[in-house]
C-alpha cells in the first residue's frame, strides 16, 4: 500500500512554475518533473512528461480512473482504483525493448519515460513556441514489495528507512560526473545546473532504472533541485523525520527550501510504503 502527498511552489523569483507532479495511490505511482528554467515552455514539457508516464502506466499496468489536476502550492488529490496486471510481455508493447534485468514495473517506467521523450521532442520540433523545451523526471512505482525508480536529469528520490537516508538516484549533471557522490561540493559548484541528460532534447535519452525490495514503513522523498539544491542531506533527513505525517513532511521541505532562499520552483512528494 502506498500513501503519498505532494506540494509545489512557484517560489519568489521565477515568473511561472515549471515543476509538475502527479500521485496515483491506486497505481502505487508518484511522478515529479522539472521543466528546465530558461528553456521555452519548460512547464509544458514537465506536464507532458508526467502525463505521459502516468498515462502509460495506467494503460499498460493497471485500470485507473482520472489521475489528478493542476496543483499550485497544494497537494494533488489522492485517487484510488486499479488492479495489478501480471501479464507477460507482449509483442509491440515494448517499443524500446524489454530489459530482462528489470522487473515488469521497471520496464513499464523505462518505456513510459522513453515515450515521454519522443512526445516532447516531436512537439518541440513542430512548434517554434515550444522549440528547445525539455525536462527532468523521476518516477517511483511499487509493485508488491519491489520499488522501481525511473529517472532522467537531476530530480531526486531519497529513501528514509531505519537510521539511514539514501539517495537512490544519481544526477545527470556535469558536476556529478566529475565530483561523484560529494553532494555538498555539487551543491556549491557554479556549474551545478548544467545537465548532461534530459527528457525531450534528443531522439533517444538515457533512462536510468534502479530497483530494490522494501520491507515496510520506508519513506520516499521525490524532490526537484529547487529543494535539494539548497537543503543538504542532513537537513532533508531531519525534516523528513520530524514530520508527523506526509503532508507536514512535504510542506516542510518546500517551506524550508524557500526560507533558505531557493531561487527555483520547489516541489516535494513524500510517500510511505505500508506492507500489507
Spans of model-derived segments:
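PP2C/PPM-type serine/threonine phosphatase catalytic domain
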Residues: 1-276
Amino acid at each position: 500500500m502506498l500513501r503519498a502527498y505532494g506540494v509545489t511552489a512557484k517560489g519568489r523569483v521565477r515568473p511561472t512554475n515549471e515543476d509538475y507532479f502527479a500521485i496515483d495511490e491506486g497505481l502505487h505511482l508518484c511522478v515529479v518533473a522539472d521543466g528546465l528554467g530558461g528553456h521555452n515552455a519548460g512547464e509544458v514539457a514537465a506536464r507532458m512528461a508526467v502525463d505521459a508516464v502516468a498515462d502509460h502506466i495506467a494503460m499498460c499496468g493497471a485500470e485507473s480512473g482520472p489521475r489528478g489536476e493542476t496543483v499550485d502550492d497544494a497537494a494533488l488529490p489522492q485517487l484510488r482504483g486499479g488492479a495489478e496486471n501480471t501479464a507477460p510481455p507482449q509483442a509491440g508493447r515494448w517499443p524500446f525493448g524489454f530489459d530482462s534485468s528489470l522487473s515488469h514495473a521497471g520496464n513499464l517506467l523505462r518505456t513510459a519515460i522513453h515515450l515521454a521523450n519522443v512526445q516532447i521532442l516531436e512537439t518541440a520540433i513542430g512548434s517554434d513556441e515550444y522549440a528547445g523545451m525539455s525536462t527532468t523526471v523521476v518516477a517511483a512505482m511499487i509493485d508488491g514489495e519491489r520499488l522501481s525508480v525511473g529517472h532522467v536529469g537531476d530530480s531526486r528520490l531519497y529513501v528514509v528507512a531505519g537510521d539511514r537516508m539514501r539517495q537512490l538516484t544519481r544526477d545527470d549533471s556535469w558536476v556529478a560526473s566529475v565530483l561523484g557522490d560529494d553532494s555538498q561540493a555539487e551543491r556549491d559548484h557554479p556549474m551545478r545546473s548544467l545537465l548532461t541528460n534530459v527528457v525531450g532534447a534528443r531522439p533517444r535519452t538515457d533512462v536510468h532504472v534502479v530497483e530494490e525490495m522494501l520491507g515496510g514503513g520506508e519513506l520516499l522523498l521525490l524532490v526537484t533541485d529547487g529543494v535539494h539544491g539548497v537543503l543538504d542531506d542532513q537537513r532533508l533527513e531531519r525534516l523528513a523525520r520530524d514530520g508527523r505525517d506526509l503532508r507536514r513532511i512535504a510542506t516542510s521541505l518546500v517551506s524550508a527550501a524557500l526560507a533558505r532562499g531557493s531561487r527555483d520552483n520547489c516541489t516535494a512528494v513524500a510517500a510511505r510504503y505500508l506492507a500489507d
